[in-house]
From Swiss-Prot:
Binds 1 zinc ion. Keywords: Cytoplasm, Metal-binding, Zinc. The keyword Disulfide bond does not apply. Zn(2+) binds at residues 64, 68. It holds the Pfam family SprT-like. Its main location: cytoplasm. SMART domains: SprT. It comes from Streptococcus pneumoniae (strain JJA). The active site is at 65. This is Protein SprT-like. GO terms for cellular component: cytoplasm. Belongs to the SprT family.
Length: 149
């Protein structure tokens, strides 16, 4: 899919206005589907959203960013808090928030247990069991499950 052509097509079909600036993929975007840059008018999109959530969701994200784009160049309120933005987004059926991506928070938890009092600890990061002990009874910690990395 040619991204620039697709965004121009969505702009004409859903807004009736041309899109004349630059569009690009940005793999560094993590928690957002796209970004609008008022300074030069270009748009960035997250390729993972397109790959993992499909074209229907991606089209709604393109509409969201085009709402920012067209309202900014019309001199209207283009920020999320503005009424103009909310009304236009509703009219074109754009997404307000990106659905969470699968595997976005998939870091497995490590489970430790105190050998004395059986207190359990879940951690994202590894604990040095030679250096750290249980916070309740000062007993030794034991790694129960080692997830595959």
């Amino acid at each position: 899919m040619k991204l620039t052509d697709y965004v121009k097509q969505v702009s004409l079909e859903d807004f009736g206005r041309p899109f004349i600036h630059h569009v690009q993929w940005n793999r560094r975007l993590r928690s957002t589907g796209g970004r609008f840059f008022p300074k030069d008018g270009h748009l960035d999109f997250n390729p993972k959203v397109y790959q993992e959530l499909g074209l229907d969701v991606f089209r709604k994200i393109v509409r969201h960013e085009l709402c920012h784009y067209h309202l900014y160049f019309q001199g209207k309120g283009y920020q999320h808090k503005d009424r103009d933005f909310k009304e236009l987004l509703k009219a074109v059926d754009g997404l307000r928030f990106v659905p969470s991506l699968p595997n976005s928070n998939s870091k497995p938890l490590k489970l430790y247990r105190c050998q004395s009092c059986q207190q359990r600890y879940q951690r994202k990061r590894r604990i040095d069991t030679k250096r750290y002990r249980c916070g309740l009874c000062r007993g030794k910690l034991l790694l129960i499950n080692q997830p595959e990395d």
